[in-house]
């Protein structure tokens, strides 16, 4: 009888060790700082549409911090620079927002998001001719940004 319990205990222990060794499966699902920032930006846009500017700005600030971290880890990524320009512009710093956009365009001149958002920045800062140049780049993209 004791032998039976001992064998059962050993088998249970053996299966427990194997299942713990397999892990939880979460190791590969950690979101990057960039991905987290994009999710936060989407949330901020929803608050902005509802007129909740303060909540939107808090999210833009949070996203901006994550994007700065992302840019340090993987510098000069056009998508990251696009959203850095976007969050910076949304927080009212048009000059630095423009710098991020222009740096992104040096890397990827036909980047749809950068051209769209830079055009918006030019409209807000009353530089319509420059906004039209951004539109010209988007003219043949067959995209909603145009």
Predicted feature locations:
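Conserved structural position within tetratricopeptide repeats
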Residues: 65, 69-72, 102-106, 139-140
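Residue-level recognition of tetratricopeptide repeat
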Residues: 77, 111, 145-146
């Amino acid at each position: 009888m004791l032998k039976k319990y001992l064998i059962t205990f050993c088998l249970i222990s053996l299966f427990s060790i194997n299942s713990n060794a397999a892990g939880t499966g979460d190791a590969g699902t950690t979101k990057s700082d960039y991905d987290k920032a994009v999710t936060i930006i989407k949330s901020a846009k929803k608050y902005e549409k509802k007129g909740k500017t303060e909540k939107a700005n808090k999210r833009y600030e949070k996203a901006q911090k994550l994007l700065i971290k992302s840019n340090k880890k993987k510098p000069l990524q056009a998508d990251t620079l696009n959203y850095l320009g976007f969050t910076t512009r949304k927080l009212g710093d048009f000059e630095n927002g423009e710098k991020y956009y222009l740096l992104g365009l040096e890397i990827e001149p036909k980047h749809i998001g950068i051209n769209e958002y830079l055009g918006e920045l030019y409209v807000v800062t009353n530089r319509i001719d420059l906004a039209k140049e951004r539109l010209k780049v988007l003219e043949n993209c067959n995209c909603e940004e145009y």
